[in-house]
Amino acid sequence: MNKELLEPIMRAHGDKNKDLAAAIGMSVPNFSTIWNGRGEFALKYIRLIARRYSLTPEQVYKIFI
């Protein structure tokens, strides 16, 4: 995951890590593990994040692939 691309989008929507974690139904510790590069988002979470921020397919690819 490219957090350098996702973070500005989150901030533009007024979200911090804990806000996004809650919005997608993930615990903060699990979110932090992924955020810090020790895991990856499952497809269901990628879909929820993409919907929340109205990400284009290109943005999804650049952030998560």
List the model feature ranges, each with a label.
Residues M1-D15, K62:
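A short, Lys/Arg-rich alpha-helix, primarily the initiator
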Residues I9, A23, I34, I63:
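Residues in the recognition helix of alpha-helical DNA-binding motifs
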Residues N17, V28, I46:
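Helix-turn-helix DNA-binding elements, focusing on the entry/boundary residues of the two helices
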Residues D19-A22, I49:
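Short alpha-helical "recognition helix" segments of helix-turn-helix
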Residues M26-F41:
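Recognition helix of helix-turn-helix/homeodomain-like DNA-binding domains
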Residues K44-Q59:
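DNA major-groove recognition helix of helix-turn-helix/homeodomain DNA-binding modules
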Residues Q59-I65:
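Short amphipathic recognition helices of helix-turn-helix/homeodomain-type DNA-binding modules
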